[in-house]
Structure formats: C-alpha cells, structure tokens
Amino acid sequence: MGALAGNPDAGLAVLADVSEDAAEKARHLVDSGAVELTVADVDDDLYAETVLHLDGHHARACIAGDHTNVFLVSRDDEVLESKERPAAGHVPPTAALLQGLSLAKIYDFATTVDIERIEFITEAERLNSALVDAGRDGSYGIGEGAAILGSIDRGMASDDLCTRMTAYTAAASDARMGGAPLPAMTNSGSGNQGIVATVPVTVAADYAGVDHERRVRALALSHAVALYAHAGLPVLSAFCAATTAAMGAAAGICLVLDGSYSAVERAVASMTGDVVGMVCDGAGCSCALKVSASANAAGRAALLSLAGRRVPGTNGLVHDDVDAAIRGIGRLGTEGMKQTDPEILSLMMAKQTV
C-alpha cells in the first residue's frame, strides 16, 4: 500500500486518505505474487524493513523502536536519510518515568489534581464513543459487539453492567479493526488499549449517574494506570496489552462506583490473576474478542473489589504488593515471552499468506 499511496508526513495516519482505487491496486499487487514477506532476524522488539524493486533500481526504508521511527532511507545503496538506530531493549524516558511511579501516587494525582488539567481526557470519551456507535450494528470486523447486544435483545444474555461494558468495548474494537474511518484515542500507542481504558469506565459512569468531575477523574485514573501497567512491557511482544489497559479500566470503574483507594488496589491486584498472559497474535478482527474479554475481566474485578474481596497474594502472579505484581507482569512480557513471539510468527508464516 505504501508503494502506491499514503502521506509520509501524517505519522500513524499515513494511510488515512487512501482511495479505494489505490487499495484495489495494492490488492492486485499482492495477488500477482510481487510481494514477498519474511521474518527479520533481528533483536529489536519492533522492526520493519521494506525494499522496493522497480526498473533496475531499489529503495529501502527501515523502522525500529517505534512505529513511526524511520531510521534509514536509501536508494540504490545511497543513504538519503539516516539517524541512530535505537538499541534493542532500550527503555524510552517516558517508560522509565512511569516505572518509577506507584499505584498510590497515580490515584492521588487523579483524585486531587486540578480538574482543568485533566479535562482533555474527555476527548478520549468522545472519540472512542464514536467507535462504539459505529460498531454497534455489526458492519465492521466480526461484529462481536452487535452479537452480544443482539443476544441481550433475544434474552440470551443479561442486560447488566458487565455485559454492557463487554458489548460496547467489543463494538468499538470491531469498528477500529474493521476499518471504520474514525480516529481512536490511544493508550501506550494502541487504539485498542485506549478503547479498553475508556469505554468500560464511561459505561460505569453512565450506569452510576456520577457527576462530570467524578467521570473525568475516573477516566484519568484509568488511562494513567493503564500507562503504568504497560510501562514495563516492550513496545511489541507476544503479550496482549489489552489486559494491562484493563487494569486501568478496573481502577477507573472502582473510582466511579466506590471512590476509595483500597477498592482500586483490590481490583488491580485481582486483574493480575485473571486474563494477564493472553497472547497477541497480531492486529486483526479477533482483537475484539481479546479486548472484550479484558473489559469483562475489569468489570468483574471491580465488582469483586466492591464486595471487599480480591485474589490473595499467594496465588501465582498476584502479589500482596500491587506494584510488585505489576512489575512482575512487565517481566513476564519482556523475559517470559521471548520465545513465544517467534513461535507465533512461525505459525502465522506457515499459512503462507501476506
């Protein structure tokens, strides 16, 4: 697609204005067998290299470390643009800052900061709620959100808080992954993580009828906790980060329905004993399933916490110290899943599809 269309100055929106004609030409290029896809043998967490051959010439572009970090552009081996390639395993300054925080500090910030400083988070609700609306009719992706809502209408699923969270979050992900021409407010660089950190909290806020300030603070807490929980993970790995975003959602839901730090702490601790460890097998329509499972887990963790209960620290990845549990999850995603990622790639490549 990038060889035929796109705006190189638009960052992650590089393909936002691609025409259907260009998309059809790209599909024809793939169908013709002109595109070869291989797995790069590199140590980088995120790496992509494209080489284009045409009329006896070739051009090369390489990305590493971040989705928009083009560190090398060349034509016929003549370097046109270059900058230092990020070292494998490099921890960006923002991630290092987040790793130095604690759940208690984040809670204190979200609940005491001047509300004007965090009003911007309402944009997350506006953008991601538009994705919910777009995905509710089932016209995008696998239509999971619409399927759940239809099950409610037919009496096959209950119309309760957790089911609504699950359905609406799935609908937004359906739209996001199914190509709806709408932006998402991201979290940790991911639209789906932004959806998980936003939609369950807004559903809870609508259910509880809380005032604007409580709503804003809950969204801010959710997104901040999601960033904190994700900070120990590589920029890309076999670890599905919808689960860390859901830790933020669980915190935000508790702030809506209870407000106390103890409730938030119990919910986040319980999340480390639930869906954490779910694998990422690449971006696709099935992300809606993982996203909705994570949202549902967040809702259940919040309800468990409101009953004064949590998963005890003697269980597996859970820890009595919630910050230690979060650090452990970062270690799991960084060290524990090193071999998982290449195995997933191998299974995908074995299908011989582009």
From Swiss-Prot:
GO terms for biological process: L-cysteine catabolic process to pyruvate. One of its GO terms (molecular function) is L-cysteine desulfhydrase activity. Signal peptide: none annotated. Pfam families: SDH_alpha (PF03313). Belongs to the UPF0597 family. This is UPF0597 protein PPA0217.
